[in-house]
Amino acid sequence: LDYYKDKKEIWILRRALFAIEDMEKMLNRLKNELKKAKAGKLHFPKVPRWTGEERPIIEGPSFIAPAKTPNSPSRMRPVFFNGYGAFDQVKADIEKFPNYGVNIIQIEFGPVDIFPKEDEVSDSAIKEMLTILDRAKKVGVAVNLLISPHYFPKWMLEKYPHLRKKREGFLDYCLHAPESKELLLRYIKIIIPPLKDHPSLHSICLTNEPVNVEEPCEYALRDWHIWLAQKHGDISTLNRRWGSNYSSFEEIPLPNPFSSLYDIQTPLGMDYVLFNQEWFAGWHKMLADAIHEIAPDLPVHAKAMTWTLTGTGEVDLGVDAELFSSFSQINGNDSVNFYSHGVGEFAQGWIGNLLPYDLQRSVKDIPIFNSENHIIPDREARYIPPAHIRCALWQQAVYGQSATTIWIWGRTYDLRSDSAGSIMHRPLCAEAVGIVNYDLNRLSEYVREIQRIKPQVHIIMSNSAKVWDGGHYSDCLDKLYTALTFSGVKIGFVTERQLERGEIPQTKIIFIPNMAHISDRAFEALKNFKGKIVIVGEVELLSKNEYDQKREDKLTGERLIYRYGETTWQDIWSSLRPRLRDWGIQPPIEVFDNKSRPLWGVAFLCAPTKYGTLVNLSNYRNERVELKLRTKEGSFAIDLLSNEKISLDPLPLNPLEVRLLLLKKR
């Protein structure tokens, strides 16, 4: 206890000193800015703000809504929503948030609030929500409601003991049983009608960090057998594909993820992964359909953890980006990007945002809403520079995020709390959120052009490769993605399911990242691809089907060397850059260091637009760089963030500094 007390006092003192230093910097800067403004040497940019009068409509990656600039009428334009979640403090501070530069919150309630007892229905949570929506509308703050099916009434578990199932994650009851489904549908029928038409209700988040890991039950077993019959048609076809000898579908067990015998690297395990993904998406669709039966135009999404969308170790959790997009009007997620404190080659964990964002945008061109944006670790005691916050939020937006609520707006003296060390303890970080939101909204029409860049290349995202090839596949994919990012290439993904449906991307290149396995139907579709196939790896790739059966047929293509455990992303980058030109992939600009060598660590994207050529730059390195931009478009640029005319040689970039340039000719 004495140790804890001393540690707590040290932590509180350090936090106070950080905050004082931050606020002194803010005060001194503001004094200088006001002095310049008074002398006519500085003009603060005008920022359009969402009026709160109409719910945004969705156009591609954008939320389009009425926004008003001071002394001007409101007009429809792209609006970015940046704010906070998730509990009592965001409710209390709604009226303060516009002055902090933010315009959205996420809050929640669940079935237990509506059904506290078996024979009681309470409308208290609905009344509180309506009051919050009214307050938010007055000040132009949007509200995302997480309907939290994980807040499930205990009396239901007592009344229906079979709902008690061993599970992972927030949803801790049997999802397959009809009793749990019926309660959730009744819950939706009660809460949606009084809320659905409020303009401040931005959207509905269906679930919090969903995963479907459950011990088998009779209902899941029944659904499993139905799915197998629909997929294979007859048991002899299944036996041929699996290399098995079952006499009927009913004989096939449903895998138990908690069993010591659980193994997805079998034909049965492969099909279980696909079944679990499709079933869980269908369960979400049940909730979405119930909402849309009452409110057809109310957007919904789910807060899927991005690593469950991309990771090989998470492929069996039931979460699939493409299937989740099918019931969503917004690509929802929960994503992580932490400051590195100088450890490693990059200043922040950027790939954890950008790669899954590109995946989500590839399966459905709708806005991304990261409704639990982890940009500061829980209980973080170290200082976080505001540049980390600014870079993370800006780049997330550039890659398609048009709404986000940051975890977490709360303050505490309890070191064990998730709120310890949160952004509410960090004045310059909180200020950075507001400034980024202002910049995104005043430049929203430019940022939208960057968001709309069409992929120039595609990478295959394959469940078969995730199951059978594991880290050999994901390691290559991550390194390839990194190399392409620092080559100025807009990256897309094509999924195995898309290929199976014959949806072949209209692009010049498809990359195959060290994957031996792909489904037979996807393989056949690749034969019809008109562009160039680039194989990244040494071994014979695409040599087996989804059930690990050897494939005699082969695909030919270009090859990049990759050896698992040896090849770095820089190795791929060095060999990739010159070959991209040969393959017809040439960004409008090239980035070099001050010695005219290719420069790694600076992510850049270019968009030819009606305004001119836009260039977005972000320095992910731990050190300042001086770069040169080579372009045919012009010899200088306007930095749209600072509204300054700048030279393209040299162009300094501090760690985690972002720039949005508009190229100009002299």
Segments the model singles out, each with a brief description of its role:
Residues 5-53, 76-78, 339-666:
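Carbohydrate-binding surfaces of carbohydrate-active enzymes
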Residues 25-104:
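N-terminal carbohydrate-binding accessory modules
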Residues 166-352:
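Polysaccharide-binding and catalytic clefts of secreted carbohydrate-active enzymes
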Residues 78-87, 108-126, 166-185, 207-214, ...:
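The substrate-binding groove and active-site-proximal loops of carbohydrate-active enzymes
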